[in-house]
């Protein structure tokens, strides 16, 4: 029996799941005092250190809107795009406290999803020219 695999759709059920996940992440990251470490240690204008495949930009936009609806997200790249070290992925404008409150969550989210996308791209390239194919399957529990 052949199983039909297809690309994950950015549909309403997926967006609702993401909203639930973001609520948990915001509560965990910003429950009491906010992100004092980032405020103290991360320099303004910090950039990524490695090239890779970007993933999670729509999710990051939703995360920012949840933390501070007054902040504006302007993507400078697209999901699936290969980006270079230090390349700008998005520009954010808005109240500084809202942006700083969202910063750690955005970096964690984009770093995690882009890391997965980068590794997946390496696997796809490794099997190019063979009959092998790479598929995403969830082997973890929700939450």
Residue positions per predicted region:
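Acidic/glycine-rich phosphate/pyrophosphate-binding loops and surrounding catalytic core
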Residues: 2-143
